[in-house]
From Swiss-Prot:
This is Brevinin-1SN1. Expressed by the skin glands. One of its GO terms (cellular component) is extracellular region. It comes from Sylvirana spinulosa. Residues 1-22 form the signal peptide.
Length: 71
């Protein structure tokens, strides 16, 4: 009976280690996905900001002239 317990304990121990490693890898993958979303948001902001500045550069002088009526 004792000889059966050793292999079973070994299998249980190895299975526990395997599950632990898989869980760590899964957590690392989830962190990479979250970091990737932040990078994508930053890229969208970088592309969006110059377009907004160009539009503002064209509209702002016209709006100032219309408000002050000095143009």
């Amino acid at each position: 009976m004792f000889t059966m317990k050793k292999p079973l304990l070994l299998l249980f121990f190895l299975g526990t280690i395997n599950l632990s490693l898989c869980e760590e890898e899964r957590n690392a993958d989830e962190e990479e996905k979250r970091d990737g979303d932040d990078e994508m948001d930053a890229e969208v902001e970088k592309r969006f900001l110059p377009a907004v500045l160009k539009v503002a550069a064209h509209i702002l002088p016209t709006a100032i002239c219309a408000i002050s009526r000095r143009c």
